[in-house]
């Protein structure tokens, strides 16, 4: 039965996590509505608080009806429902990608607000097959062609318990239980490449889908047994990440690893240093890899970072002005700034604002700054890095730059730590 398969999947994916809360993303389509009912049964059996999240992308007239329908289902199941809205700002370029990122930003921020650590999504077996075909068309490497049933976004664990369940089984479950759902009319449009691939797969023989699933399993196995261990070794051996939010890559050690792993190392560092949630495209990383092989110093920008070769090392630091966050008021004891730094205040301070250093501020306090340590660690790139660090201001006056122990008043006491979104157990800070 479908529920037994779902229960086996979710228990294996979550393990002994000791959860008391969990969220499920539900759009109103057949996949996510089926997931909601399955997750509700599982949550009841395990005494877990289940929250339902819907995101209206404001792109279709039907979307508000879908959200209202999901809200009614949630109410009937005595589950909390949260309706979120994505603002596309009438910008329709690269809309699918932006909408996806916006959707996950909204959902994971809500999870963080309510201390929910896990979000369930309705990606099923057919979705995995379509993703494989799309990535194959884009000439993705082995990491890109692999699939994962557990991912992280904004420090929230995204779990896909329907990964080995075809859409047909989900629809059959809903029909047998007389449960309605909405069909997204855009799914039949030839405007999107995914839909064209879906139509071709539907017309093809069943063995084509089975062969794709088999190939993906082989790739996942190769990744787990060869490339992931190599990636762990590469990062442990060749990477140094500093509390100032920059990193050095030892290019001599880097050179001995496979090209697939090299791409992942660069992307790993770009995600951590930029504070972004998503990796750069391969076509963006490839020019950097080519420059590295030329054995000459260079300085490029990529993915919100400056990438600079200094002899046998690659320095990566945050690019100034590239979507650095606006000022944030430090209302609570601690705050995450730029998705990279955690700032904690050890005493009450009125109207503290976290921001970055402006040129005017720098000119005012320049003579009082001790940058010797940062200068030494960063191979004299201290000034560029300084302008990407968090500072604390009161009434437009800089009162603290904790990284370099600058305090306008001895009574002002703050702590700062580098806390990027994507940190693995083999990452070490210097």
UniProtKB/Swiss-Prot annotation:
GO BP annotations listed: tRNA modification
Chain positions recorded as ATP binding sites: 27-32
GO CC, one annotated term: cytoplasm
Nucleotide-binding is among the record's keywords: yes
Source species, domain of life: Bacteria
EC number from the UniProt entry: 6.3.4.19
UniProt keywords, alphabetically: ATP-binding, Cytoplasm, Ligase, Nucleotide-binding, tRNA processing
Localization per Swiss-Prot or TrEMBL: Cytoplasm
Molecular-function GO terms, alphabetical: ATP binding; tRNA(Ile)-lysidine synthase activity
Catalytic activity field: cytidine(34) in tRNA(Ile2) + L-lysine + ATP = lysidine(34) in tRNA(Ile2) + AMP + diphosphate + H(+)
Pfam short name (any one): ATP_bind_3
Protein's job: Ligates lysine onto the cytidine present at position 34 of the AUA codon-specific tRNA(Ile) that contains the anticodon CAU, in an ATP-dependent manner. Cytidine is converted to lysidine, thus changing the amino acid specificity of the tRNA from methionine to isoleucine.
Family indicated by similarity: Belongs to the tRNA(Ile)-lysidine synthase family.
Note on domains (UniProt): The N-terminal region contains the highly conserved SGGXDS motif, predicted to be a P-loop motif involved in ATP binding.
PANTHER family to which the protein is assigned, alphabetical: TRNA(ILE)-LYSIDINE SYNTHASE-RELATED
Protein name, as recorded: tRNA(Ile)-lysidine synthase
The gene coding this protein: tilS
């Amino acid at each position: 039965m479908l529920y037994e398969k779902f229960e086996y999947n979710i228990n294996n994916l979550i393990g002994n996590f000791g959860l008391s809360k969990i969220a499920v993303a539900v759009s109103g389509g057949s996949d996510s509505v089926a997931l909601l009912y399955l997750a509700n049964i599982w949550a009841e059996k395990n005494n877990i608080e289940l929250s339902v999240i819907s995101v209206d992308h404001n792109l279709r007239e039907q979307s508000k009806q879908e959200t209202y329908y999901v809200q009614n289902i949630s109410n009937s199941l005595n589950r909390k429902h949260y309706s979120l809205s994505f603002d596309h700002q009438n910008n329709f370029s690269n809309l699918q990608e932006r909408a996806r990122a916006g959707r996950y930003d909204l959902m994971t921020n809500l999870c963080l607000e309510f201390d929910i650590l896990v979000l369930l999504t309705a990606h099923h077996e057919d979705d995995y097959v379509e993703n494989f075909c799309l990535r194959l068309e884009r000439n993705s490497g082995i990491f890109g062609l692999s699939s994962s049933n557990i991912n992280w976004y904004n420090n929230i664990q995204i779990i896909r318990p329907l990964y080995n369940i075809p859409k047909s089984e989900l629809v059959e479950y809903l029909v047998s239980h007389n449960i309605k759902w909405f069909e997204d009319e855009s799914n039949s449009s030839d405007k999107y490449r995914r839909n064209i691939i879906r139509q071709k797969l539907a017309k093809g023989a069943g063995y084509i889908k089975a062969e794709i699933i088999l190939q993906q399993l082989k790739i996942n196995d190769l990744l787990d047994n060869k490339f992931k261990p190599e990636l762990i070794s590469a990062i442990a051996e060749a990477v140094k990440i500093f509390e100032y939010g920059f990193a050095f890559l030892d290019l001599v050690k880097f050179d001995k690893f496979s090209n697939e792993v090299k791409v992942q190392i660069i992307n790993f560092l770009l995600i951590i240093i930029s504070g972004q949630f998503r990796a750069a495209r391969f076509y963006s990383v490839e020019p950097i890899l080519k420059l590295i092989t030329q054995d000459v110093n260079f300085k490029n920008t990529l993915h919100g970072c400056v990438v600079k070769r200094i002899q046998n090392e690659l320095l990566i630091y945050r690019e100034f002005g590239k979507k650095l966050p606006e000022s944030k008021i430090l209302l609570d004891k601690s705050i995450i700034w730029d998705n990279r730094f955690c700032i904690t205040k050890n005493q009450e301070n009125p109207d503290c604002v976290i921001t970055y250093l402006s040129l005017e501020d720098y000119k005012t306090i320049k003579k009082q700054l001790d940058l010797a340590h940062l200068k030494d660690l960063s191979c004299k790139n201290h000034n560029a890095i300084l302008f990407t660090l968090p500072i604390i201001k009161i009434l437009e006056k800089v009162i603290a730059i904790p990284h370099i122990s600058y305090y306008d008043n001895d009574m002002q006491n703050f702590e700062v730590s580098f806390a990027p979104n994507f940190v693995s157990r083999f990452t070490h800070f210097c």
